[in-house]
C-alpha cells in the first residue's frame, strides 16, 4: 500500500524567467473588446447568403482563420490566440449581440471584467455589424421560439445559455490528435464520395474548416520563422524554429511528440 502524505510544500515548483516575462507582458497589456472577427464573419455571411447555414458557418470560420491578425511572443513555446491582443475579448455576432450593444460604453468602467473599447469600433459595430444580424442571430431565433411567457421567466432564472458558445468544452481530442486537420480533411473527401445527399453539406463544411485550420497553423509557422531570422540569441532562435516546425508538422500529419500534441490541442 502506498502511503500518501499531505503537504503544503511548494518545493520544486518555481517560475522560470521565461514564464515570468510572459506573465508580466500579459498582465501589463490593456484589455480591449475586439470586433475584428465580427467584421470578417459578417462580411463572409453577406457574400454567401444563398449557402446552407452549415456552409456559411464553415466559410466564416475559415475566413477568420485566414485573415485575423496573429501575434507571437518570442518567449512562447505554445502559440495561438483568437486575437492579436493577449487579453482581448471577442464580439461574436452570430450568437447574439444585444448585451454588447447595450453595454459597450460601460465596458471600461463596469465593476468586473472590464474591457477598453475603441470609439470607432463601437460606431462600426452599430453601423455595419449589428444591422445585418438583427433577426438572424441565435439569440434572436431562440427569442422567437420561446414566446413571451418564457422570456418573462428568463428574467428570474437562466433559460438556456443562448449568449454562450459551448463547443469549446466538448471536442473529440483523441480523434483530433490521431488524425490532425489533414487526416480529417482526407476523411471528409472520402465520405463525400459515398455519403447520402443530405450528408454532403456536413462533409463539405468539414473540408472547409480543416482547410482553414491548416492555413492558420502555417501562418504561425511563417510568422515565427520571420521572427527567428531577426533573433540574436541563438538558443532562443533555435527554440523559435522548433515551435514554428511544430506548427507546420501538425498542419500536415498527426502529432508525434508531446510538444506537438499540446500545440495541436491548444
Each predicted region: which residue ranges?
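Structured, charged N-terminal subsegments at the starts of enzyme catalytic cores
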Residues: 178-266
Amino acid at each position: 500500500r502506498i502511503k500518501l502524505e499531505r503537504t503544503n510544500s511548494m518545493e520544486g515548483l518555481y517560475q522560470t524567467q521565461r514564464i515570468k516575462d510572459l506573465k508580466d507582458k500579459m498582465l501589463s497589456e490593456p484589455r480591449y473588446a475586439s470586433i475584428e472577427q465580427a467584421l470578417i464573419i459578417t462580411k463572409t455571411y453577406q457574400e454567401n447568403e444563398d449557402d446552407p447555414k452549415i456552409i456559411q458557418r464553415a466559410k466564416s470560420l475559415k475566413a477568420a482563420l485566414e485573415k485575423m491578425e496573429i501575434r507571437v511572443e518570442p518567449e512562447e513555446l505554445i502559440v495561438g490566440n483568437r486575437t492579436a491582443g493577449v487579453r482581448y475579448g471577442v464580439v461574436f455576432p452570430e450568437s447574439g449581440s444585444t448585451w454588447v450593444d447595450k453595454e459597450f460604453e460601460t465596458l471600461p468602467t463596469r465593476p468586473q471584467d472590464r474591457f477598453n473599447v475603441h470609439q470607432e469600433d463601437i460606431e462600426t459595430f452599430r453601423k455595419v455589424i449589428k444591422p445585418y444580424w438583427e433577426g438572424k442571430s441565435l439569440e434572436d431565433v431562440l427569442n422567437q421560439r420561446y414566446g413571451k411567457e418564457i422570456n418573462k421567466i428568463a428574467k428570474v432564472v437562466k433559460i438556456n445559455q443562448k449568449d454562450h458558445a459551448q463547443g469549446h468544452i466538448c471536442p473529440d481530442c483523441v480523434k483530433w490528435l490521431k488524425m490532425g486537420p489533414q487526416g480529417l480533411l482526407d476523411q471528409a473527401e472520402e465520405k463525400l464520395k459515398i455519403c447520402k445527399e443530405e450528408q454532403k453539406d456536413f462533409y463539405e463544411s468539414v473540408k472547409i474548416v480543416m482547410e482553414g485550420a491548416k492555413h492558420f497553423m502555417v501562418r504561425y509557422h511563417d510568422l515565427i520563422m520571420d521572427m527567428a531570422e531577426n533573433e540574436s540569441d541563438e538558443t532562443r532562435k533555435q527554440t523559435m524554429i522548433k515551435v514554428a516546425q511544430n506548427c507546420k508538422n501538425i498542419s500536415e500529419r498527426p502529432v508525434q511528440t508531446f510538444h506537438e500534441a499540446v500545440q495541436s490541442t491548444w
